[in-house]
């Protein structure tokens, strides 16, 4: 009984931090205009990217991941001229629909960013990889990709987030 108030307090602090992060992201996004903002502007607003992918055309894609606690992953493209050309939140149904059986784990990682959780199942020789996201304005969901022993997609599913505090 003594631990319950502490658990509730920790949950409220975590929720407050998450809401602050979302608000900060919205402010950062509002301050960046495609075709105008520079790489320096992006880094000033979002900090150092977690991952940088070099594209064949000379552009680079910066990943700003909000997993495991958040429900968004941002990918920001900076063109060869140093200007931001795209800012996308990649955890969405359109991107999930691109995940097809046979795709490699690396291809999925590149499309969706770092996941919230990876769970290997030795007996079935499968690995379940989960991304937390919002469906609509406030429905917490998990997009799960199941990989076989060869690290290729077997199947996908979207389910309600069991860790979400729905009231």
Question: Language-model segments: which ranges?
Answer:
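Residues within mature, well-folded domains
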Residues: 24-167
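Sec-dependent bacterial lipoprotein signal peptides
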Residues: 1-22
């Amino acid at each position: 009984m003594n631990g319950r108030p502490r658990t509730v307090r920790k949950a409220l602090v975590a929720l407050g931090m998450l809401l602050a992060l979302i608000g900060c992201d919205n402010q950062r996004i509002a301050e960046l205009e495609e075709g105008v903002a520079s790489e320096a502007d992006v880094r000033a607003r979002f900090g150092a990217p977690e991952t940088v992918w070099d594209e064949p055309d000379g552009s680079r894609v910066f990943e700003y991941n909000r997993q495991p606690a958040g429900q968004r992953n941002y990918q920001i493209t900076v063109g060869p001229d140093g200007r931001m050309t795209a800012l996308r939140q990649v955890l969405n149904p359109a991107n999930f629909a691109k995940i097809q059986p046979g795709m490699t784990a690396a291809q999925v990682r590149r499309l969706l960013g770092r996941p919230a959780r990876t769970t290997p199942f030795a007996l079935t020789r499968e690995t379940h990889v989960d991304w937390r996201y919002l469906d609509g304005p406030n429905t917490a969901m998990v997009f799960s990709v199941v990989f076989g022993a060869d690290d290729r997609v077997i199947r996908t599913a979207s389910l309600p987030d069991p860790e979400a505090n729905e009231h």
